[in-house]
Amino acid sequence: MTLRPALLLLTASLVAGCVSTGNVDPMKTGKGRDEARDAYTQLGIGYLQEGATERAKVPLKKALELDPASADAHAALALVFQIEMEPKLADEHYRKALSQRSGDARLLNNYGSFLFEQKRYQEALERYQQAAQDTLYPERSRVFENLGLTALMLKQREQA
């Protein structure tokens, strides 16, 4: 084979390879679905931060359709329902988030705050104690403050 036909064959195969890979649906790959889930979750959190809880539910629901076990989407929905004063739904989503990441100090602290708000002080104390075990958690001082307030509510002044 001469050089010219060989180069032509090589170029044709490269072009064919480029064309065939351009047709892949990113939602059919694990990476694509993970990126979409994360984008939907971030969008929902953005709406939540703006106080638009109803709007936050739509992308968070889509995130959970892509990954029903997403701890971040469940945690964000828990906050949505907590703000909307739907304690049963908030509790359900906090539990689902923690079932995926049981040692996550941020989740434990947020769930503890929810439990405190519901006057479930003993449960709140337990969540805060779990969160305090993470010595690298950046909000650890807040966890100790929450522990003290909860101990006071439980009339455990020596712990406070």
Language-model regions: role of each:
Residues 14-35:
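Bacterial Sec signal peptide processing site at the extreme N-terminus
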Residues 36, 70, 104, 138-140:
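Residue-level recognition of tetratricopeptide repeat
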Residues 42, 76, 110, 144-146:
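Canonical tetratricopeptide repeat
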Residues 32, 66, 100-101, 134-136:
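Structural marker of alpha-solenoid helical repeat scaffolds
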Residues 73, 107, 114, 141-143:
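TPR alpha-solenoid repeat register
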